[in-house]
């Protein structure tokens, strides 16, 4: 996979703790995250697959891969964005996610869009 300036995807993430869906007594902490994928390049591109690395506060790592996101493989023209919200369940009050998307430009060129690490944290627990 190659990366070049014409194929530039920006990814922004926000996360929040879902207290009502969590059960602290059972060590079940539910988080939602919203992703904004923006095509900052000058060629249309389609999101083909996702690759996540999810790490809890104990260092337990889970890898998740799959086609597209939320059942879609969105195609973004230059200047377009796609937003979606998904969720994750951790066994600890804090954790982290990071990963990348496999992308394909209209000309068939494959490239990677990086998802920088972001924090998952129950409010008032981050030190």
From Swiss-Prot:
GO terms (BP aspect): error-free translesion synthesis
InterPro entries assigned: ApaG_domain, ApaG_sf, Uncharacterised_ApaG
Annotated ApaG domain residues: 3-127
Pfam families: DUF525
Protein name: Protein ApaG
Organism: Xylella fastidiosa (strain Temecula1 / ATCC 700964)
Gene it is expressed from: apaG
